[in-house]
Amino acid sequence: MRPEGAGMDLGGGDGERLLEKSRREHWQLLGNLKTTVEGLVSANCPNVWSKYGGLERLCRDMQNILYHGLIHDQVCCRQADYWQFVKDIRWLSPHSALHVEKFISLHESDQSDTDSVSERAVAELWLQHSLQCHCLSAQLRPLLGDRQYIRKFYTETAFLLSDAHVTAMLQCLEAVEQNNPRLLAQIDASMFARKQESPLLVTKSQSLTALPGSTYTPPASYAQHSYFGSSSSLQSMPQSSHSSERRSTSFSLSGPSWQPQEDRECLSPAETQTTPAPLPSDSTLAQDSPLTAQEMSDSTLTSPLEASWVSSQNDSPSDVSEGPEYLAIGNPAPHGRTASCESHSSNGESSSSHLFSSSSSQKLESAASSLGDQEEGRQSQAGSVLRRSSFSEGQTAPVASGTKKSHIRSHSDTNIASRGAAGGPRNITIIVEDPIAEGGQYLCSGEGMFRRPSEGQSLISYLSEQDFGSCADLEKENAHFSISESLIAAIELMKCNMMSQCLEEEEVEEEDSDREIQELKQKIRLRRQQIRTKNLLPAYRETENGSFRVTSSSSQFSSRDSTQLSESGSAEDADDLEIQDADIRRSAVSNGKSSFSQNLSHCFLHSTSAEAVAMGLLKQFEGMQLPAASELEWLVPEHDAPQKLLPIPDSLPISPDDGQHADIYKLRIRVRGNLEWAPPRPQIIFNVHPAPTRKIAVAKQNYRCAGCGIRTDPDYIKRLRYCEYLGKYFCQCCHENAQMVVPSRILRKWDFSKYYVSNFSKDLLLKIWNDPLFNVQDINSALYRKVKLLNQVRLLRVQLYHMKNMFKTCRLAKELLDSFDVVPGHLTEDLHLYSLSDLTATKKGELGPRLAELTRAGAAHVERCMLCQAKGFICEFCQNEEDVIFPFELHKCRTCEECKACYHKTCFKSGRCPRCERLQARRELLAKQSLESYLSDYEEEPTEALALEATVLETT
């Protein structure tokens, strides 16, 4: 597979190696960008930049892309910067000039200074500003649409010259700008799944609507056996008399001309002129007004909100559909949808065709024989903004002359084109479904129950609309039952239809048993098909008001009664061309090997989930009539056996602190984790983990990442990263080698070195950075003796503790108390609680001076305040009334730990507190008096006591 847009003509081993190297680089750059974007939009936060480090990482990935393939500056002998490339946005896109001009003026105003801002710094500032303002994709589209302008700054192997990768890059940027992870599903997964190319090149066509002016000349080695397929327009070019190579086209009629986009990339101008395929006339080109580059970039469908396309069409609410849907082959529609090819020369009404090709690919050998002469017939079609999905898409909307135009959601064709011999009958199968019945009806399923399908909704659409990826395990279990029931019901209904069809055919054969009549009918049928196929193109030329109509069949019809393609030579005469079931089966067999493996998305091919199995089974019946989901008879009705989540036990542990909020625990919540893995919990760890043994630790984790639970093969455990805080191993997505100080190492070893921690641990440590959670006295009291700075802070906190208690009862110390409140409360109200911020400030020597200043201010207040002087102590040993002492005077005062009395250090030598002795003596005296009172009361009644004793003796 060649890198699209890499316009190079290389031959030999060097050219192949260069192309392979550029492919690997493109793959790596796009993979890094998509990984970063997935991490940003998967958090479901209102602000995508709330994820720590997300903006810096996305800036780095975009810088790598913009620097890739830059032409070196030959004059200054240095690498050029992309600032010269992007600053011309102000000319190409004036509405985006505001974001660039401010940085241009910044650069030009500082050029005269010696410390001027370099171009590289200005470019990085512009890139970061554009990402923050969510306007980077809008600024890059006009630049990336002009390939000649890109070649002035980039080499041919640059990332920006690969159309497919640029389209995926823009989709990633739009996913971030809109905070919509569903846009990432539109990216072709094959670009990430393989680095090597297959011998037979099957290129998936892309919707390159953002690159209207792209051209490409293929390498000489790729001239043969290159197939490009897209079912959005099953049209190819006949074999040229000058060349025998096959050429097929993937139409994207949103550019300036009617020439197919892939064809413009693959054919040189000379080859295009010699192609015998008829092109539209000048009058036809004049009638159609294609969108400009900006309008086309604005109308590119990247989100459900942009699908409305209010600039050129009036959409009805029922036409808007959200989410990826898959084609239900032959789905019956309650409202007939027709696609007509009408000429608008009478009313002068312009309509642009937007047949964007999807991410699916197929071999179009049969398409070259089936629709090789239809290009002129596509004079004008209603614009329909297509949505990319895992299957190919392409459907035109009906346009009635002079009436209101409205666009509908397009769905896939069947990826089937019949392959016939040269000159034989050419058959085409176009099967569509009604998108109105499927759009705008996504109801919220309560408690894991599948909602009932809407009337006329297709089976594949009904199965694929469920968000299986984000459901809990219990809901996935119920999903298996629902999907199994729907498949069984669909298969049984098809069997019944086939049996009834066989019985009808046998009855018809019995009636028409004459062999000659049967042969004559067969010859007439073949002859009519040949005549209609040959007259297909002239019929379109002669018809001005003719219609190209695709009518979806009814659900009661069998699989043989496929869609009818009606075309007429005049408005009055009409011939119906019926497509037989045998033609569908032949085309399905011819494309079975390639289309099935290519149309299914990458995640479906490598998944064993219920939805993947169901979609794979339904693809086996491609081209056949499938019943609508609403027509199925469910094996077990939901009202008889409702599918709900299993009940969670009501007896949940309630914290004593949350007793007043106990009612919140009655809510039924989903249980995260499973028997093998549980997500990390925010916990405070005080101990240093022992040196880990990787094999043993990972085995204890059941070979799963401690953060996301993803399973790792034992051969790849070396890729896991160790978190020093939690002591567990994480995958590279959950552990980005962030470095933080570890609390346990500070408390045990006074080690402030930064260690590698997981993203979860980093976020947790940042959240608790200022929380006083660490009691040094309880965790490691020996740290006071080992660390001098920490002991000094402890003494200052003891003084502040006593001062604050004194000032709370002093009416003259209100201003001083306000200054005490400037520092965190735990520093003045507790003696041993610290936060990580306090410990770090102590290590740097910043906390001690702040506390010392408060201590000096408090001591000065006590010295001149009469109220505070009255709260002092007089030493009972020396009885010096002139020397009043206070508890915060640690240099000369000693406080009793029991009674809190204060004495001079020099006087308090015996180790016994006089106040404690007095209190003890008083307690003993009170106890003695209580005992004497009890005994006196007992002696006043001796007779009663003797009588009681006698009674007791008699009873014994």
Curated annotation (Swiss-Prot):
Function comment: Inhibits PIK3C3 activity; under basal conditions negatively regulates PI3K complex II (PI3KC3-C2) function in autophagy. Negatively regulates endosome maturation and degradative endocytic trafficking and impairs autophagosome maturation process. Can sequester UVRAG from association with a class C Vps complex (possibly the HOPS complex) and negatively regulates Rab7 activation.
GO BP terms: namely: autophagy; endocytosis; immune system process; negative regulation of autophagosome maturation; negative regulation of endocytosis; negative regulation of phosphatidylinositol 3-kinase/protein kinase B signal transduction
In residue numbers, the region (Interaction with BECN1) covers 490-542
User: By what name is this protein known?
Assistant: Run domain Beclin-1-interacting and cysteine-rich domain-containing protein
The source's domain of life comes to Eukaryota
Concerning SMART domains, the annotation shows: DUF4206, RUN
Q: Where is the RUN domain?
A: 49-190
Q: Where is this region: Interaction with UVRAG?
A: 302-585
Q: Interaction with PIK3C3: where is this region?
A: 50-181
Q: Which UniProt keywords apply?
A: Autophagy, Endocytosis, Endosome, Immunity, Lysosome, Phosphoprotein
Q: Which PROSITE patterns match?
A: RUN (PS50826)
What are the Polar residues biased-composition ranges?
Answer: 270-319, 379-395
Q: Where is this region: Disordered?
A: 233-423, 547-579
Matching entries from InterPro entries are given as: Autophagy_HostDef_Reg, RH_dom, RUBC_PIKBD, Run_dom, Run_dom_sf
Q: Where is this region: Interaction with CYBA?
A: 552-609
Q: Name one Pfam family in it.
A: RUN
Q: Which cell locations does it reside in? A: Late endosome; Lysosome; Early endosome
Q: Where is the composition biased (Acidic residues)?
A: 570-579
Where do the record's region annotations for Interaction with YWHAB lie? 205-437
Modification Phosphoserine occurs at = 198, 250, 268, 390, 412, 513, 547, 655
- Gene Ontology cellular-component annotations: cytosol; early endosome; late endosome; lysosome; nucleoplasm
Q: Where is this region: Interaction with Rab7?
A: 705-956
> Which intervals carry biased composition (Low complexity)?
233-242, 339-371, 547-566
